[in-house]
Swiss-Prot record:
It comes from Ectopseudomonas mendocina (strain ymp). Catalyzes the reversible phosphorylation of UMP to UDP. UMP binds at residues 60, 80, 141-148. The keyword Transferase applies. This is Uridylate kinase. Pfam families: AA_kinase (PF00696). GO terms for cellular component: cytosol. InterPro entries: AceGlu_kinase-like_sf, Asp/Glu/Uridylate_kinase, Uridylate_kinase, Uridylate_kinase_bac. Keywords: ATP-binding, Cytoplasm, Kinase, Nucleotide-binding, Pyrimidine biosynthesis, Transferase.
Length: 247
């Protein structure tokens, strides 16, 4: 169930959490690790327990990637549609994990899938969020050529989220890949234009520009660090904050 976390007040009232599909694999090379799902459901439940409204977007890279399928010779639109369906599978798995923990959740898909998910409707999504349900946005934007990062930023803007939280395998944005370059330095704060000018690869160009144009703060943090998600939401200095004025 949604855990009550005493003594910690949230900095954000409504968040959009972006999880990569790869994060669901755990130590596996493909698919979904149920233990990872359960841990993520527990961490999301902690947020619900302190009154935070949570929207979720999950990638599909643990199952299919449209761009990779296209590179292998498949029609790009077909590949992207397969990638969208992969995000729906991940969303259903996450909803199941949340509901098993007695955390109310709903999947809203950008592609109509009657009997499987609800169809995305902004006004309905807002109502579900206000009643404390976790809303999982699936199937990206519903259009090919757009990443799930772009979908996350779009949904965050639509639902008037306070921040986009991008969960990654590193604790922020670095000057280079910290797994490959031991001298890579971490940024505490950045502006959108600095991310674009330095080609830091936090998100794709469309996603960053969406956040910049609508002044949507973005924080990149390490979801694998225990308690990091809760710490971010209560105002802790986790990861890297990207916003209009980084002074």
């Amino acid at each position: 169930m949604a855990q009550q976390t005493s003594g910690r007040q949230p900095r954000y009232k409504r968040i959009l959490l972006k999880l990569s599909g790869e994060a669901l694999m755990g130590s596996e090379d493909f698919g979904i690790d149920p233990k990872v799902l359960d841990r993520m459901a527990l961490e999301v439940g902690q947020l619900v327990g302190i009154g935070v409204q949570v929207g979720l977007v999950i990638g599909g890279g643990n199952l299919f990637r449209g761009a990779a399928l296209s590179a292998a010779g498949m029609d790009r639109v077909t590949g992207d549609h397969m990638g969208m369906l992969a995000t729906v599978m991940n969303a259903l798995a996450m909803r199941d994990a949340l509901e098993r923990s007695n955390i109310p959740a709903i999947v809203m898909s950008a592609i109509s899938m009657v009997g499987v998910t609800d169809h995305y409707d902004r006004r309905k999504a807002m109502r579900h969020l206000k009643t404390g349900e976790v809303v999982i946005f699936a199937a990206g934007t519903g259009n090919p050529f757009f990443t799930t990062d772009s979908a996350a930023c779009l949904r965050a803007i639509e639902i008037d989220a306070d921040v986009v939280l991008k969960a990654t395998k590193v604790d922020g944005v670095y000057t280079a890949d910290p797994f490959k370059d031991p001298h890579a330095e971490k940024f505490e704060r950045l502006t959108y234009d600095e991310v674009l000018d330095r080609k830091l690869g936090v998100m794709d160009l469309t996603a960053i520009c969406l956040c910049r144009d609508h002044n949507m703060p973005l924080r990149v943090f390490n979801m694998n660090k225990p308690g990091a998600l809760l710490n971010v939401v209560v105002g802790g200095a986790e990861g890297t904050l990207i916003e209009e004025d980084a002074q």
